[in-house]
Amino acid sequence: MSTVIDTLIYDRTQADVNRVFTLKNKILTEGLNALSAEEKAEYMAGMKGAYNYTDMNRVGQAVAYIANRMTSLPSELAAYRSEKGVDDDPIYEVPYDPASVVVSAKTDWVMGDTPTQSLAKAYLNNLTVLRKQLTLPADAPAVPTTLDQLTYTTANNIEYLLYLIDLTLTEVEAELYSKIDRTVAAFAYVNLCYSGE
């Protein structure tokens, strides 16, 4: 199943940035009509080397998606345990406090919007909230302290961090479901042994 996580962009390059500036300079010096139909379509589609409202919305959507997964997973696991007849135990609990997963993901940026300092702070705070929930790989990017002077590397790091958080959450989820399944299998084996079969 495809999700917003599959749309994250973390492979921007300097060449992508250069392409944006090439087309932008062409527009500024010769006008929009100086672009070929292909260049115009490329420019209007939201270029990978630019960071604009579509990128901000994608990050907001990914934040909301991950936060929703984090907050709903405990009840999903509880329902699964109940269905399988497995009692609650700390070994089946998520390694974070779901109540602390509080984000304010903005997903309605439009062309021309400029992030205010408070919106930029909230944008980065969302990343901080999600990042601190799980133990991530040692090379996981840090949350940037500001969006001022944003580079393509920082933009890549923001979206790669979200990818890693989601991947780690998926691994945690799979392990917790597996623990429940192994418990059920162990009970079935024990019952089989003690029933004389």
Positions of the model-derived regions?
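Extracellular "spike/adhesin" assembly and maturation modules
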Residues: 1-197
